[in-house]
Amino acid sequence: MVQVFTNYRAAQRGTELHALAALLIEKNIKVAEKPVAFNMFINDAIAFKMKPEQLLYFSEYAFGTADAIIYRPPILRIHDLKTGVSKPSIKQLEIYAALFCLEYEPNLTDLEFHLRIYQNDSVLEHFSEIDDIVHIMNKIRNFTKLLNEVSKDME
């Protein structure tokens, strides 16, 4: 019971921190230069002129919200703020990159993916390969098609 409550409070705090970060980015308000992920996330998003809390939508089965995103050809930059203690995975950001490509259909030829996860006092930076993102895009298309067919069969 205590663990459930603790997890709930941590999730609630994470939601509040994401909302604060989005507001600070939208208002272009930088925060203290400290090696704290929250501050680095906000300052970097402002410096790169990123849009906070951007919905990426391909279908009713495939969507997500990027914490901060900007596309300036040929670079798609996605940053994610993690407020919990679980080990971060770049896979979520690669899915967001795939959703972006499916929704906005940029020229994939020279596209670069600059992905960052901000957690605790560190930043994990990753540069994904186009083949990895295209593979995820194909999975999303296939699963969406399958779920659409299953949904029609259930009507």
Identify the meaning behind each predicted range.
Residues 56-138:
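Nucleic-acid nuclease catalytic cores
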